[in-house]
A protein has these predicted regions:
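Conserved AMP-binding/adenylation subdomain of ANL enzymes
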Residues: 8, 12-29, 36-124
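C-terminal boundary motif of the adenylate-forming
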Residues: 196, 240, 245, 279-303
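Conserved C-terminal "lid"/linker of ANL adenylate-forming enzymes
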Residues: 284, 293, 325-349
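Gly/Ser/Thr-rich phosphate-binding loop
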Residues: 78-81, 91-179, 283-284
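Conserved adenylation A10 loop of the ANL superfamily
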Residues: 1-3
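Conserved ATP-binding/catalytic segment of the ANL
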Residues: 187, 194, 201-261, 289
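Adenylate-forming
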Residues: 214, 248-277, 304-315, 333-337
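Residue-level signal for inorganic ion chemistry
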Residues: 80-83, 193, 247, 276, ...
Length: 349
């Protein structure tokens, strides 16, 4: 692990960014869901709110959907800041099951009824988050595209940002009214972004950034610092992406995570993981390359939901194998999943 040295200019710039775009008022309420040990949570669920004179409510337990719903209902926060996993869990457990019944699928095909249902679902979701917020800001990891499509179809007020500890943390953001679906926004104030690619709009390259938010370097580690920040001050994020002509950045994966297929094809495990996460009873998953260069998926199933439905461990194994077959039907031959391994507990974070 490396210690990140953040100067006061980075803390100031991140806080100033929040004052410029989040516009909370003295006395507004925010629920702190994220750990204070992470810059994302520290910067945007404490430092900014403290400076703005807001009330910060700290969760004292692990943020399960039930606990979060209770907190939203009681506090009614003015803005919601979270990581994708929490939002996805809430939607998968409380929204998708209601939309995926046969009756609901049939009703959604009728135009006028479709609009009424979506309006009701949107209102239900807004109330689930307290009914008093301007937008939900999602960041810290890739956001599931199926969940995002649902939110967009409902005109739900959400946006996806991008950052890292080395930038204290913000790199990209866009207000939900101007946000481009699938992206993570545009360069934040006082930050620049470029893609290390001959064609940044179409050919994936490493995302580079520089500006007031960027760290001084890694604590007592000049070698790692020199590898991360080049002579022109560009921080090499290690993330791969593209950027359109309007400056919207879309992340494709991590350069360190990228795998090579049998004939040299680029495989981005995050894209496969996203497909797997949409399958039945999948809570978390990681795609790895085995010693024989074939791909395997490590899956932590949603045991709570499975057992509630009366399923046995053997049933779960069968369903996961069916999931493997289903995801392979959507993948090219060089990125097929050949094996599933079930994990008994959540992955370490």
């Amino acid at each position: 692990s490396k210690g990140v040295m953040l100067p006061y200019r980075s803390l100031w710039s991140n806080t100033q960014f929040a004052f410029e775009v989040l516009t909370l008022q003295p006395g507004n309420k925010v629920i702190s869901i994220l750990p204070m040990a992470h810059m994302y949570g520290l910067a945007f669920e404490f430092i900014y709110e403290f400076c703005a004179g807001c009330h910060v409510y700290f969760l004292t337990r692990m943020p399960s959907p039930k606990i979060i719903f209770q907190a939203f209902s009681e506090v009614k926060p003015h803005i919601v800041i979270s990581v994708p996993l929490i939002i996805e869990k809430i939607i998968k457990k409380n929204v998708l099951p209601k939309l995926e019944t046969l009756k609901m699928k049939l009703l959604l095909k009728v135009p006028l009824i479709n609009d009424k249902i979506k309006e009701a679902v949107r209102e239900h979701m807004v109330q689930a988050f307290g009914g008093n917020f301007y937008e939900v800001i999602i960041g810290g990891a890739a956001f599931n595209q199926d969940v995002e499509r649902l939110l967009r179809s409902l005109d739900f007020p959400y946006t996806v940002g991008y950052g890292m500890t080395e930038c204290g943390p913000i790199i990209c953001y866009e207000d939900w009214l101007r946000y481009k679906p699938g992206s993570c926004g545009k360069a934040a104030p006082r930050m620049e972004i470029k893609i290390d690619s001959p064609d940044p709009q179409n050919i994936v390259g490493e995302i580079l950034t520089r500006g007031e938010n960027v760290m001084l370097g890694y604590y007592k580690n000049p070698e790692a610092t020199a590898q991360a920040i080049d002579a022109e001050g560009w921080l090499h994020t290690g993330d791969l992406g593209v950027m359109d002509e309007e400056g919207n950045v879309t992340i494709k994966g991590r350069s360190k995570n990228m795998l090579l297929g049998p004939s040299g094809q680029n495989i981005y495990p995050e894209e496969i993981e996203e497909k797997i996460s949409n399958l039945p009873y999948v809570c978390e998953n990681i795609v790895i390359q085995q010693s024989d260069h074939k791909l395997a998926a490590l899956i932590y199933p949603d045991f709570e939901e499975a057992y509630k439905q009366g399923l046995t461990d053997a049933d779960i194994e069968r369903i996961m194998e069916e999931n493997r077959v289903a995801v392979n039907a959507e993948l090219p031959a060089y990125s097929q999943i050949t094996r599933i391994k079930i994990y008994p507990e959540e992955f370490e974070k």
